Amino acid sequence: MMKKYSLTTHSTETCQILFTSVSNVFKYIPSGTRRILIMYQDSVSQVLPIFSAASGVQCYRYLIPDSESAKQLGVAEQCWRFLAQNNFTRSDLIVSCGGGAASDLSGFVASSYLRGIKVIHIPTTLVGMVDAAIGGKTGINLKEGKNLVGSFYSPYIVLCDPSMLTTLNEEHLKSGLAEIIKCGFIQDESILSILEHNAQDHMDCSQRVCAETLPPKLLEELIHKAVSVKITMVDSDFRDTHKRQFLNYGHTLAHALEAATSHKLPHGQAVSIGMVYAAQVAFAKGLIGRNILTRHERILETYGLPICPPEVQWRNITPYMQRDKKNMQSNDTDSDKDSREMPQISTQSKLVLLREIANPFISSVSHTVLLKAYEAMFPQ
């Protein structure tokens, strides 16, 4: 049975998030569409035969790189040129098939080509289903940091088919679980309780739970809970000025670690480490007790996610943390200053922290506390 969510992205626009078979995609193609560009990753090429059944629509395929390699300006330019060379118009359509990087890139390409053509996302990873494809954020990376160039652009439809997750490997499932667990910490504590209860039944001799052993019905329940959390936060703050930023819990350090390691650290692992770090910061500031910090470590480690950063020196991380989007707001109120003067490097960074579970807020934290919390994450 199909399940549907509605997400209001602008005052006059609503994005439908549909849980149904991917084979139903042609039911939702906008009328008048003559051309479709399918931007896909090699790992999901098995989806392509579905589009060969299109009637009256010309389908083009465009293979994009896997993972963060797709999110480059050069790749976006190649896509724009392909669209132009094949005479795509505003009445045509892009369909993305793949993980979070596929929806990030295709959304950015769609938002900028001809100043906007429709895009449908078909997320095929757990991260894509619960996070990246939902909410209208698009982005590509620069050497200076992750997702520094992008737009807010609502997809026409997001089509989620949980049956596609059955072929995901353990690492991809764990990455998605990190985003689901994040939703438990910032809003819906029942997510944490479900995972903790499941761990009691499926823990192996190493005190770990293999993500691949999650019962399909349980995984689908967790997906719907995480999607509901994201919709609640995006619906009231599409342009990411306040409440939506809570979805960045754990992401300040995560994005910095990804950039500092040249994206060798998978996103979900980085988010896991970032959440433990945010809990360490909150604990250092006296906002939460050790019990909440320990709960972070226990649930993430139980599901095979890392809780300790790789060996990356603090001085290599701080430049990326300072470029975090939450810090990109001018505090300069002196009108006599030369507008060309370079701003001073802040001695603080903004992080999403918890006062308690499901009670997030944004806090400015001194670099002294940030360093102390980072050092506390390494075994003594």
From Swiss-Prot:
Cofactors named for this entry: NAD(+); Co(2+); Zn(2+)
Entry binding sites for Zn(2+): E179, H251, H267
Gene from which the chain derives: aroB
Cofactor binding summary note: Binds 1 divalent metal cation per subunit. Can use either Co(2+) or Zn(2+).
EC assignment: 4.2.3.4
Keywords: Amino-acid biosynthesis, Aromatic amino acid biosynthesis, Cobalt, Cytoplasm, Lyase, Metal-binding, NAD, Nucleotide-binding, Zinc
Organism: Tropheryma whipplei (strain Twist) (Whipple's bacillus)
Gene Ontology molecular functions: 3-dehydroquinate synthase activity; metal ion binding; nucleotide binding
Protein's name in the database: 3-dehydroquinate synthase
Catalytic activity as recorded in UniProt: 7-phospho-2-dehydro-3-deoxy-D-arabino-heptonate = 3-dehydroquinate + phosphate
Compartments it resides in: Cytoplasm
Pathway note: Metabolic intermediate biosynthesis; chorismate biosynthesis; chorismate from D-erythrose 4-phosphate and phosphoenolpyruvate: step 2/7
InterPro entries: Dehydroquinate_synthase, DHQ_synth_AroB, DHQ_synth_fam, DHQS/DOIS_N, DHQS_C
Sequence similarity: Belongs to the sugar phosphate cyclases superfamily. Dehydroquinate synthase family.
Biological role stated in the UniProt entry: Catalyzes the conversion of 3-deoxy-D-arabino-heptulosonate 7-phosphate (DAHP) to dehydroquinate (DHQ).
GO cellular component: cytoplasm
Positions annotated to bind NAD(+): G100, A101, A102, S103, D104, T124, T125, K137, K146
